[in-house]
Amino acid sequence: KYYIMKWLSDYVREFGIDGYRVDTVKHTNEDVWKDFKKVCDQAFAEFKLNNPDKVLDKNTPFFTVGEVYGYGISGKQIYDFGDKKVNYFQNGFTSLINFDFKGDANKSYEEIFSNYDKILHQDLTGKTVMNYATSHDDGWPFDKERKRTYETATKLLLAPGISQIYYGDETGRKLII
């Protein structure tokens, strides 16, 4: 595991990569990600120190977003495996992909925005989520027929958190083949 951490942190140290998106996070022990974040934080600090002319914001920390399949903002900081509960935010992640959004998008703007704002400012202070409406990992997207593209875009782009645009979301590309 340390070989891979070294390899990935070398990209940070050499090129100034400021964040990673990690796929299938829950298939590895959670403490691995805490160690990985520490290694990347150190590499990013070294890059900034050695390349002050390339630094866009000296106070921005290294960013990690994780795909914990099934995690939703409604769980706040906890992902429940059934036999154990894990806080991935305390184990190296700045953000997690929010699998709740595609269902929450059926709610009113006010309901989505108020709820997400409350959770992000009370339960996830200093952390965030990445919302999506469609994904290659998910067979139950919001607006599968693409009849509500403006509503999808508005809710996705204005909801508190980060917006993940899946190829075709921006053009209304067909999801049903």
Residue ranges of each PLM-predicted region?
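Acidic/polar loop patches that form or flank catalytic/metal-binding clefts of enzymes
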Residues: 163-169
